[in-house]
Design a protein with these regions (language model features):
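Membrane-proximal helix-turn-helix segments that form the acceptor-binding/catalytic region
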Residues: 130-137, 185-203
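A short, active-site helix/loop in glycosyltransferases that binds the activated sugar's phosphate group
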Residues: 151-152, 181-183, 187, 199-223
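Conserved catalytic-core segment of nucleotide-activated headgroup transferases in glycan assembly
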Residues: 67-70, 89-91, 188, 197, ...
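Short hydrophobic beta-strand element within catalytic cores of glycosyltransferases
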Residues: 346-351
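Acidic donor-binding loop of glycosyltransferase active sites
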Residues: 139, 320-333
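Conserved active-site histidine-acidic residue motif and adjacent donor-binding/catalytic loop
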Residues: 125-129, 292, 303-319, 334
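A charged, aromatic-enriched C-terminal amphipathic alpha-helix characteristic of glycosyltransferases
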Residues: 371, 385-420
Length: 420
């Protein structure tokens, strides 16, 4: 039988008709474009006032959390020191609808085709094929992702050439090592190239851990600043003293199957081992929060129940009730869920990554070098035993700066001066 199959394959390889059909099929699926860098073409304008531009993928409600929310907060804080300037938010990947714009009541939504001088504008530029956007001689750009940095770097080059002036400084708001979002590929190389830009670029890092990672790898910027994470102000309203929390035999996992760096499959495989090593696994409830997915049966009568993307109030209630947490982030960014869980009295399992070790930040965090399923399952069993022996095991001192109401971007006035 195997010889017959080999004979058929040899004949097929030499058949011109089959070859042509195969090539036609391959070509029909061939993608020679990189969607993220769809040309972002500027055009000249008579507008000469200083204007701060935030380049952000989206401001839609479904995206307005985590990194984008932090970037907009930074933009708002910077504008407090730029009162003589105009401001503009440019969305590159998605257009907001009327409901999305309710959170931006101080802004006017304008078309890129209109050259409007008004202040506080939102311009949707996701549908930009064969379109241009007005860029003046005093426009300054803040990039929030590798592709928006790619755009900004090209824009300031055009701006300098067209208006015959020195290239403007770019602010690069860096919240992770973004080449790591891709396998070795075109996108990997493009993301990396934005850190190697030869022009003047001010880096603002989300955490000293991330800044140190970049420094350790030899990436250099004109100026460098960093800020440390703080507990979400809305979530903080639900934070109560540990004594008032009713901790249950509940494990809360940060489950985002579509985000590779959160290692959802690895967490599930670890739990499949844990259910057979934990003597009373069927007494524990396992909840997944972050992104909706089907419930997952992991054996021994235990099911991972998906709660998806929860409201802050519902998420806070899960934090108050859960005894243990598992949240992985295969990147140098510290990640918010482990810190949130720890401050709500949860014993949290996470991972180290190069210079990142979150166990140094809070005693409720257990950060592993080896995150094989066996290693995670073994540590989870230890934490179950610790909680069952002491229901107050998670009652540990908080990070004062993380909970403080103080200014997050302490450097922002100095940065504003560097732009002038």
């Amino acid at each position: 039988m195997s010889r017959l199959i080999e004979h058929i394959l040899r004949k097929a390889k030499n058949n011109k008709v089959i070859k042509k059909a195969y090539q036609s099929t391959v070509n029909s699926y061939l993608n020679s474009h990189i969607g993220e860098i769809t040309p972002f073409n500027p055009r000249s304008t008579s507008f000469e006032k200083r204007r701060i531009n935030l380049l952000v993928p989206s401001i839609n409600q479904e995206h307005l959390f985590g990194g984008i929310s932090t970037a907009i907060n930074f933009f708002d804080q910077l504008y407090k020191y730029e009162q003589d300037s105009f401001r503009r938010i440019i969305t590159t990947d998605a257009a907001p609808n009327s409901e999305d714009l309710l959170k931006f009541s101080g802004y006017t939504h304008v078309s890129s085709e209109n050259d409007v001088d008004g202040n506080s504008q939102i311009v949707s530029f996701n549908d930009r094929y064969n379109k241009t956007i007005p860029v003046g001689k005093e426009d300054i750009f803040i990039a929030t992702s590798w592709w928006t940095a790619y755009f900004a770097q090209r824009i300031v080059k055009w701006q300098a050439e067209f208006y015959t002036q020195k290239p403007k400084r770019i602010i690069y708001f860096i919240q992770d090592f973004e080449p790591g979002f891709y396998s070795w590929s075109s996108q990997y190389s493009l993301a990396l190239s934005t850190y190697l830009y030869k022009g003047e670029q001010i880096a603002v890092f989300n955490s000293s851990l991330l800044k140190n990672f970049f420094n350790n790898h030899g990436y250099k910027f004109t100026e460098e600043y960093y800020f440390e994470p703080k507990l979400n102000s809305s979530l903080k309203k639900h934070l109560i003293s540990f004594d008032k929390m009713e901790k249950k035999k509940k494990i809360l996992i940060y489950g985002r199957p579509s985000v590779a760096r959160n290692a959802f499959a690895l967490i599930v495989e670890s739990l499949r081992i844990w259910v057979w090593t934990q003597p009373n696994a069927d007494q524990w409830e396992v909840i997944s929060a972050g992104e909706h997915h089907s419930d997952v049966e992991i054996g021994n009568g235990v099911v991972i129940k998906s709660k998806g993307k929860m409201s802050l109030e519902d998420y806070a209630n899960e934090l108050k009730e859960s005894a243990l947490g598992v949240s992985l982030m295969i990147s140098p960014h510290p990640s918010y869920p482990p810190l949130e869980m720890a401050h709500f009295g949860i014993l949290v399992l996470t991972n180290n990554y190069e210079n990142k070790n979150l166990s140094e930040l809070h005693h409720n965090i257990y950060s592993l070098d080896n995150i094989s399923p066996d290693s995670i399952a073994a540590q989870l069993t230890k934490l179950c035993t610790e909680f069952e022996g002491n229901k107050k095991a998670g009652d540990k001192e908080s990070m004062a700066d993380y909970l403080s109401e103080g200014e997050q971007f302490l450097f922002i006035q100095e940065l504003s001066e560097k732009l002038k």
